[in-house]
From Swiss-Prot:
Family of the protein in this entry: Belongs to the thiolase-like superfamily. Chalcone/stilbene synthases family.
Protein name stated in the entry: Chalcone synthase LF1
EC assignment: 2.3.1.74
Gene name tied to this protein: CHS-LF1
UniProt KW Transferase keyword: yes
Transferase listed as a keyword: yes
SUPFAM superfamilies the UniProt entry points to: Thiolase-like
Amino acid sequence: MVTVEEVRKAQRAEGPATILAIGTVTPANCVNQSTYPDYYFRITNSEHKTELKEKFQRMCDKSMITKRYMHLTEEILKENPSFCEYMAPSLDARQDIAVVEVPKLGKEAAQSAIKEWGQPKSKITHVVFCTTSGIDMPGADYQLTKLLGLRPSVKRLMMYQQGCFAGGTVLRLAKDLAENNKGARVLIVCSEITVVTFRGPSETHLDSLVGQALFGDGAAAVIVGADPTPAEKPLFQLVSAAQTLAPNSCGAIDGHLREVGLTFHLLKDVPSVVSNKIEKCLFEAFNPLGISDWNSVFWIAHPGGPAILDQVEDKLGLKPEKLRATRHVLSEYGNMSSACVLFILDEMRKASSNAGLGTTGEGLEWGVLFGFGPGLTIETVVLHSVPIKPGPH
């Protein structure tokens, strides 16, 4: 008779969890940041609020965002005028859109990742779905499983209302699932649309206006598994993962789901809270590896906004090129909440390959993925890059 220890050993993978494919997608509707204030104040019938519009214009100008993608078109907003008021009861209509569109966008990202992975979808053993939009039962994880035609026995985990740090959370969970279940292939999907947060401007709540200037829609999917087969192409190894709460940060970033949708609350000192905590997180993550030079690792940082990136850069003495991939994604897509860091991973491995660098991590061996959001919660994931084999010229 076998022992429990023998069963456990047989259940566990040998090697570390590895990212095997990444897929990203956005809605078709693209908004230009430079003209967005005119559009936003027109569509919300707020053009008479000239001082507030000037403030919003400055927010958009300073955002370092060029464009964003949004499911909410002008047509949809005209059909739902309650979305355009600041605090009008509108949750039912918002939910009706979100519960359909969140899984649909997630499906497109998942199909892209599965295509790159190149394996039959029947090999997917686990699904982790993350969104801040549209709670339902059964959830978006179930809808995705049905839309993709995954096996009924696939093991699902649904994460609602996590916020901007959760791109790190899903990787941490996928790591544990892949390493503790031999042969597991975990599909993780972050799908975020601003249908629950879009609202008109208010003179009394400028933090809400900050969200209107920064947030965009997008979905990203990643396949994670340990002990890759010869047919699979590893991109990054997930070496360690940690989550912590920043001290004295209660109320720094909050969201509340109410009849009016999801309201967003932000304190002015968020950039300093993040930058003051980041070094301790990095030290705890990299001390076991003997790494203390933050310019010697590649960076995947959640781009909450330009002020946060500037303060992190300054606090750690990072060279400007360290946050290139992060700033590129912020510029091209805005802040897509949990999906952002997965978009940045995708951008980094593609840019590294296109530039002829030696690894998926800008030619470097070790890297950090850093996410933060409501709590203030911080996720720190240590990544190990994979050598890029030169392709045929």
